[in-house]
Structures are given as C-alpha cells and as structure tokens.
Amino acid sequence: MRRNIAAICLLSAVLIINFYFRLFPTYFPQLKKEARGIVHKEIQKKIKNEINITSSDFNPLAKKQLLKRSVLKYERGNWSKIKKDIDRQYFELKSKYQDQNGQTYLMETDGWRWSGYTENVYRFGYPGDTIVNGKQIDGLILAPKGGEVVSYHFLFYLSAWLYKAFSYVNSSLPISIFLFYMPLFFVAVFLLVMYLFCLSRIGNLGAFISCLFVGLAPIFLSRSCVGWFDTDVLNLLFPLLVTWFYLNALTVKSPKARLGWLFLSSMLLGLFSFTWGYWWFILLIIIIFEIYSLVKIVLLPARYEARGVTLLKQRGFLVASFVILTLQFVFLFSGEAPFKALFLQIKGVMSLNSIFVVSVWPNVLATVSELRKTNLNEISDLIGSLPLVVVSLSFIFVLFLRTLRSKKYLGPQEETIGLLFVWSVCMLYACSKGARFTMFLLIPLGISLGWLLTETLRFYKKNFLITQVIRLLLIAFVLSSVYQANRVAKEIFPSMNNTWHNVLTKIKDNTPKNAILNSWWDYGDWIKIVAQRKVILDGQTQNIPQTYWMANVFITENEEEAIAILRMLNNGGNKAFEIIDRNVHDPFASLILLKKVLLVDKEKAKNILSEYLSQADQEAALELIFGKPSSKAYFLVAYSMLQIMPSISFLGNWDFIKVYLASALDNKDNGRSIECIEKLGVNKKQIKKFSKELALIRREDLSGWVSSKLSFKSKLSKSQEKDGIVLFDNGLIYLPKEKSAYLYINNSYQRPKSLFIFEQGILGEIVYPGDTLDFSTLIFKIGQDYYALMLDRELARSIFVRLYFLNGAGLKYFKPFIQEQEGLKYIRVFEIDWK
C-alpha cells in the first residue's frame, strides 16, 4: 500500500513539473520580467532627463545618487500606475505571438499542416482535400497539380476522434485550441507508461529519476510543449510500448501469454508505421538484439546449461513470428506505402549528412539544421548534461558486461539490459548522422540513470553516510533539472508571429483562390493553412528537384533565367525535366540540356530540343518552359532567409557538370561522359579544367567542389549623413561624395572587396584592388536614410537581394504587392508579371 502511495505521489510530481514548464508558451511568463525591465528603463530615462534640466550643474556622482533615490521614490509612490504600465507592456510583448483572441500560435511549421489534416478528418472523415483512385490528395502542395498526403495518418485520426469525444463535454472550444493543448495529453500518457515500465524494473525512486530526466531533457521539452502539434511524443511512446511488450513476451512462461504479448507488440509497431515514416528503427533494434541473443546462446552454452538448444529454437521462432506479425500489421494499418519507402529511407539515413550522394540532385536534407552531424558535447547539450550522459552510457555498458559474466541478471533484467544496450549503440550511431535522433537516446539513458540510483542505494543501504550523500545528489539532480527546464522553457516561442500572420491573411484576402505562392520550403505549410493558397514547396516535400530550382531563382543574377524557371515550376513542377529525360535517358545530360534551354528564347530552345526529343515531347516541354501559367503567381521573400542563405546558395550553386564528371569517374566512364557533355555544347576548356581538378580532389571533399556557400556578413544597418559622412553601427563608414567605404576592423580601416551602390534604379559596383576584405558592401538610400550591409560579392546582384533589400527596384517581372516589417526585418510579396 505504501509503495502504491509513493508511486502515485512521485508520478504526480513528475507530471506537475513537466506540465508547468510545457505550459510556458500559453502565457510567456519570461516576458513579464522583460516588461518590468522596459518600464523601469523608461522611468529612469524620464527622471534622468528631468535631473539634467533641474540639476545640470551637479557633479556626475551626485547626479547618479540623485537618480537612484528619485527612481526609488517614484516607484514607491506610483506603484499602482507602474503595475498597469508593466501589464500593458507585458501584453504588447506576448501579443506578438498570439492571435486577436489571445491564443498563442502553433509552435512550428509542420504542426500547421498536421492541424489542417486533422480538421479535414473531423469534418470530412479523411485528411486529404479529395480522394483520387483511392489516394488522399492535398490540392495545395506541389503546385500546380497537388500531391499525395503522407501515408502516416494516426495523429490526425486520433486527435480528431479525441476532439469529437471532448465536444460532448465542451462543444464551444475550437478545434485549433484543442490541438494546441494536445501535446500535454500525449506527454501525460508517455510519462505514465515510462513510469510504469521503470517501476516494474527499477522501483519507484528509479522510475521518478528516469521520468524526470527524460521529461525535462531540452530536446524533448522543446518538442513536446503546448502548441507543438506533431508526432514527437508518439515517436517515443510507441517504441517504449513495443519494447516493453516484446520483453514481456520473452520472459513470461505461459505460451498463450507469450503469444499475446507478441501480438500486442507487433500490433503497436504496425500502428507506429501509421504514425511516423521511420517506424522501422525500433524493429531494426529488436532484430539486432535478437541476433546478439542468439549468438550469445551459441557462444555461452554453459550459461544456459541444458536449456540452450530449446532456448535457441524458442528465440528463433519468437523473432521470426514477431517480424512476420509486424509486417502483416504494417500492411493492415498503412498498406504498401511503408514498404515502398523503406529502402529509400534507409539509404537516406545513411547519407543524411552527405550533400553528394551520387545523384543528379543535391541532398536537401543535408542542409537541414536538425539533421546535422553531432558530437558528444552537442548530444549532451540537447539531453541536458555531459556528466549525466557519460555516467548513463557508462552504466549501460557496465550492466551489459555484468549480464555476460554473472547469472544474477538472468531473466527479465538480462533481456532489458541487452535491449537497452543495443538501443543505445544504434542511437549513438544515428546521432552521428543527425542531431534530431538524439531524442531517441533519452529512453535508454533515462532508464540507465534510474537503474544506477537504485543499484547504488541497494548496495550502500547499510552505509548511512553514503546514503545521505546519494540523497543530496538526488536533490541536486532534481534542482538542476528544474533550473535547466526553466531556462529552456523561457526560450520557447512560436516561429509564427503577428507580422507573418498579417502577411498571410493579406495574401488570402487579396489573391485569387487558385493563385500559386513561390517561396522557400520553410514557409509552405503556413501559406497552405493560413493563406489557403497553393505552394511549390513545403516542409514535407523539401527533398525534391523543385527545391534546387527555387534555390537557383533566389541566387541567380539573371532575371530572365529566374522567370524562365518560375514559369516551368508554375506550369508543371519538374515535369519538363522528366519529359527530356525520358528521351535522353541520362539525368545529368538532361539537366545540362534543360539549363541550356532555360537561358535562350523559344525559337532557339526549339532548335536545341529537336535534336533530342520527339515532336510531341518537344511541344510539351516548350509549353511547360515558355507557356504562360494559367494561375496568378506570387513570390515571397522574408528576413529569416538571410540566416539560411548558406544552405539555399549551396543548393542553388550545385554544378551539374562537375557532378556529372564525378559520377562518371565513379563508374569508370570518364571519357564517354566528357564526349557526351561536349556534344551538349559545354565549353571544352572548362571540362578539361574540371577534369584536372577532379583528379586532385578527395571523395570526401567533393561536395565542397561541386558547389559553394554564400552568406550575409552583417545585419542591415541604417544611418544618416552628417558632415559628409555616414557612420553605421556595424563599423562601416561611407563617404557619399567620394563613393567610398571603409570598415573599422582590428584597429584599422579596411576596404571591402567591392562596394555596390544602388541609385537611380541602377546597381553599380566599385571594385577595390589590392589587399582588401574578402566580402563586399551594399549601400542604398531611401529618403534621407542610408542602408548598408556586408555580404559575399556573388550575392549582391542576386534576385533575392534585389527583391528583399531593394524591393524589386529595377526588375521588370516582379511587382511589389504586400509588405510587412519589424524594424529592419521585412516580409515582402511580389506579384509575378508573366508578360
């Protein structure tokens, strides 16, 4: 009884602590402190100005003391007014992230798309906009035709069903608010399951520590707070349940019970395939664990005595049955889609960090920040603490060695330790491929930490001094976890804000319903759900050829090339390439040919294509490239693109000729490849130069050879001319009459590589020879204000810079349509004039 009461109390404490920090985005308590600081500074400024007038002849030290006393006196006498000012300021700060009803926006972009699918399930019974030939179709993605909805629908159906059930209790609550708080329900279920699993293995205190460690880990806390409507919590819940039930199947004695647990484990894994595309990772872990177990039985026969052969047969039958049942349940819940995607997914995981994957297209996933490579220090930052990570990993290894040497760990403990060890090793490898996978280390590390505490207390239970030290360490762990969670929770804000919402609402209100929005994939889900308009790219379709083409539009200096690519995309996505390639039968050559066609007029393009395409395909390709799109189209640029420009430019600068040569070298067919691309009209000297470079470059350095990253070196700065000089806060000095610029760096004035000046609709460049900095400066004037920023020279004339900073001045195909800004941060939408 006392154990049950302790379990309830500790579980309640875990839930309360976890809920408290996950509710921060509801009311943003961190902004209350910021509001107090702003009001206090305003009071100080006001009183300081008064003192400078009334006591201007006072000594500075006296003024400082007078200011301090006056502020204190004012705050004591006007606390009621100050409190109102703080509340007003606090409301202004947090309302930036909330709609007109005070409801915080969803946290990340994927959640907007999932909420749209969930609303469709609630209203129509299925997530797509329409059903075509039995397939769910989302009409707003992959414009102009639309695309198939992702195959994993469990989140949408579960959330819609729960909302329907909740509506019987409260029918007035909008589904959007219900979905905002949905992560709390998922977290509660996950922590309950985690606690019960740990309780069955390591007791109450160990379960408490494990759940606190996992629940408050920075990577998990930030991805499971209110407003984070995604599958992240379910992606931990299902593997934990599958593992628990599978371990039960291994350790129960009754054959019927064993089959029952096996059935439940397989069914949950099948349901997991209906939840997340990478469901198979836990199946792979279990298979590797079983291979290890079978090898151990064979190599350590004395450990299992006469049961070895029988155990070998039982385990072989069990794992075979598990795999067969799982595959059947996967097919039952998700159909053929997971099997079709499985090979490509495994191949994709192996090449996550490689831009160059011997493919015609660059690997977009390698540019996504959460899929970057990690080291132990970064893993520790995402999980919480380097010492705790090292201790947890070390203890898993120690437990694993004990299972090999001691019969003390036979049965459930041996199986649990073995599976956790395999899980940890597999996820450490996965973490080396992408930071996102760090979250899947939490379960084995958390259980290991709780297990360590339980084992240590059991071993030293008769030593009063050591027991007290352990209790103090336990208190320190709880306090440090809470402190860390508070720090992380304060940094959680939605990526959506009122500026973005205003732009998207204006798009919805002022564009035709069949309009297409062209922009980077980061904004696709917002445009689709809030503006309700078609998009070329979004977060779920980022790793497709259209991403390369869009990146090319942003960084090209040639407006004619940009509009040609946009025509092609808005007419048929990547279909023009597909038509050419089915005639040429060489994707590299097809791309080189297509890029050549995009740079010429229709008549020249016709002559080029006539040599390679049939008449019908030639006409179809020309219509896609040169035909006027049937839908109105708009182009969006935003301030957040400045930070990701290295990734965008790397994709856009992808050199297919270099890739073609490298691929041919791998296939030992370099001579034939050179002959092919020469036939396509590629400069022979350039090919010869590339071939010589390729012979000198290592395989692991190829991605740095086939492309290059461009970036902005500073934020946009604003200033005015005074005495013939413009001083910017970034250290730049500009002399308008001389048209020269200097940057104060390392106690000396240095010139940029070149100076770009935009005036009278013309973007001119002044090149500074000799020893200069390795970047350029762009300066332009609006009214009496001068604006400046530092950037790579190759970016200065790009379409992105011309649109974002110069508002499309001097361009003929992009007409300003909508603009919103926060200080010097802009979101601009342009109407594309196809004429």
Which ranges hold each PLM region?
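Extracytoplasmic
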Residues: 8-91, 463-835
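Alpha-helical transmembrane segments
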Residues: 6-18, 267, 321-327
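Active-site lumenal/periplasmic loops and adjacent helix-entry segments of GT-C-fold
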Residues: 69, 73-197, 206-213, 217-238
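Helix-to-loop transition at the C-terminal end of transmembrane segments
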Residues: 19-36, 96-107, 332-345, 487-489
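Hydrophobic/aromatic-rich transmembrane helices and adjacent perimembrane loops
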Residues: 281, 426, 430-464, 468
